[in-house]
From Swiss-Prot:
Belongs to the NAD-dependent DNA ligase family. LigA subfamily. The active site is at K114. This is DNA ligase. One of its GO terms (biological process) is DNA replication. Zn(2+) binds at C416, C419, C434, C439.
Amino acid sequence: MFSPRTEIENLRREINRHNQLYYVQDNPEISDSEYDALLRRLKELEEAHPELVTADSPTQRVGAEPLKAFGIVNHPYPLLSLANAFSDTELEAWYLRVKKLLGNAAFQIDCEPKMDGLAVALTYRNGKFTTGATRGDGFQGENITRNLRTIHSIPLNTEEDAPPVFEIRGEVYLPKEGFAKLNRERADKGLSLFANPRNAAAGSLRQLDPSVTAERPLDIFIYALGYAEDSLLPDSHWQILEYFSRLGFKINPRNRLVNTLEEAKEYYREMAENRDSLPYEADGVVFKVDSVSLQQKLGDAGREPRWAIAYKFPAEQVTTLLRKIGISVGRTGTLNPYAILEPVNVGGVVVKQASLHNEDDILRKDIREGDTVVIQRAGEVIPEVVAPVLAKRSPESKPFSMEETLFNPKLSRPACPVCGGEIYRPAGEAMHYCANVSCPAQFERQLEHFVSRGTMDIRGIGESLSVILAQEGLVKNVSDLYYLTAADLLKLPRMGEKSADNIIKAIADSKSRPLDRVIFGLGIRHVGNETAALLSSRYGDIWALAGAGLDELQTIPDIGAKIASSIKAYFSEEKNIAVIRRLETAGVKLASDQKPSYKPLPLSGVEFVVTGKLDSLSREEAQQKIRSLGGTAKDNVTKATRYLVVGADAGSKLAKARSMGVKELSEQEFINMLEQS
C-alpha cells in the first residue's frame, strides 16, 4: 500500500505522460474513461490531503478563482514582429539581402506555417511553468499564466535535463473543428458567435475566469526559444525545436528545413494550395535563417529581425452583391463613398461594408449599385472592393455619379446626406466636400479626432461616446470638453461614477499635451501631425501661428500655397478663435517649451533621415529635435535628403544614401550639430 504522497506523485506522473501522448503526440494509450478515472482518483486524494496540492498538479489546470485584472509582464527579450513579403519577388529580395549581409555564405532555411493565433511567451524555472504572457507591444504583455495552465499541450513541468531557466515562445490557436463546435454551442445558448478562430482564441485567453478558458479547446505550437540560462544548446533553430519536442513541447509537424530558395518557394506553394485543408487557420509561411549565430550576426532592423520574413498568402477573394453606395461625412467635410454589401464571410470576418475611396476611383473600376463585386481584405484586414463581375451586371445599371447619388429632391440640388448643406469639389482634388461648417456629422468626426490617441489622447472617450456627447449637446465644440463635470457625464446612459471620474481625470491630464498635438487636434484641413510639428517648432505659440501671414507660412519647408491658405482660413474664422480662447481659459497648454522664434530656425530647409539604433536617444526623439530646430525629418532617403544620421545596425537606407551621395552623420556628429544649432 502506497502512502498518499507516493500515490499522488505516481498519479501525477502517469497523468502527465498520458497528457503528452494525447495532446502533443496524438497517440493515446488509454480510453477517455480510463484517463478520467486516473484524474478523479488524484482529485480525491488531493481533497483529502490539501497540504499535498502543488501548482503543477494536473488538477490545477482548471477551477482557479477569477481575476479582477491581468498583471503586466516585462519581456526580457522583445517579441519582435516580422517583415512581410507578398510575392516571390519580395521573398527573393529578402533572400539576396540576407546572402549579401552574410558575405554569400550558405545558410539553411526553416519553413513554418504562419499560424493565425496569439503569440505567447512561457517561462520555466527549475522545470516548472511559472509565467505565461501575451506578446502585447513586444516589450510588455499581460500575465495570463492561469489561463495558459488550462491548455493541456503546455507542460506544467519539464524533464530534468531542461535548462534551469528558459523562455519559450508559441502560438495559441483554436483548431477549426473546435471553433465550429464552440460556435454551435454558443448558438444553442443564444450567445453571439465568434467571427473567426483567432478572435475566439484571443477572447478565450483573456478571460478573467480561467474555468471559462478551460472549456475552450485551445492548443499551441512552439515556434522559438526566447532565451535559456546556463545551457549549451545547438546552433540550429531546427535542432533547438527538436530538443524542446523531446522535453514535451508541441512542435508543428508541418515545419520543414530546406537548403535553397527554390525549396522554400516550393514549400510556400504547397502550404498555399493546401491552406483550406489545414486543421487550423494559417495566413502565410514564416522563413527563418536556421543558424542561431547567423541570426545574431544579421541582427534586427528596427522592430523586425533581418533573419526572418513572413510570406503572406494572397488575400482571400469572394463575390457578393453591392446593394447600395452610401456616403459618409468626414471631419473636414469630405464626402466619402462606401459600399453597402450583402454580408459575406471573407477570411473569417463577416464584411458588410467596404471603402470606395472617391468618385474617380469608383469610375476607374466601373463599380455600380446592384453589381456583383469581388471583395478582398487587403492585408487580411481592410475590406476592399476589387472589381465588378461584368458577366453578372444588369443591362439597366448606371455608372456612379456623386452628384446624382446626393441629389435631394426637396432642395432640387445635390446636398450633404446629413445636414443638407451644399456640396462642392475643389479644382484638382478627388474629394467632394460638404460646405456647411456646422454640419453635425463633421463635428462628431472632429471630436473623435481631437480625443484620439495621436492627438489629445483622452482615454475613455472613443467613437461611440464622442457621438453621444455631440448628439446630447454636452459638447458643441472641442473646448466644451474641458468644462464637463462628472455630474454631466452621469446623465448619460450606462455611465457609472468610476467611469465618469476617470474620464474627467483624463480630460484634465490632456491639458499638458505638446503644442503640436493641439494644432493637429484642431483639425485644420491639410495639416497632419508632421505639419503640426513644423508649425509648433516655427512659432512656439498658438497666437503667433494665428497671426502668421500667407507669405510667411510658405517660407516654412514643406508648406505650400494650399496648406498655407488652409491655415490662414482656419484662423480667420472668429468661431475658431473663440474655441481657442476657451481652451486657453480652461488651462490647455497653447505654447511649447521652446522659446518662440520668428526668424528662420538653424535647420530650416534641411532634410534629415535617421536610420539604425541610436544610443543616447530614440529615433522619435531625434526626429523631434530636428523639427524643433526647423529641420525636416523624413522616413525615406530622397534627392532632397541633406543628411543621413547613422546608428547601429543601419539598414538599406545607408546603401541608398551612399549611392546618392548623401552626407552621413554619426550619432556624435549629429548631437554636436544639434548643440551648435
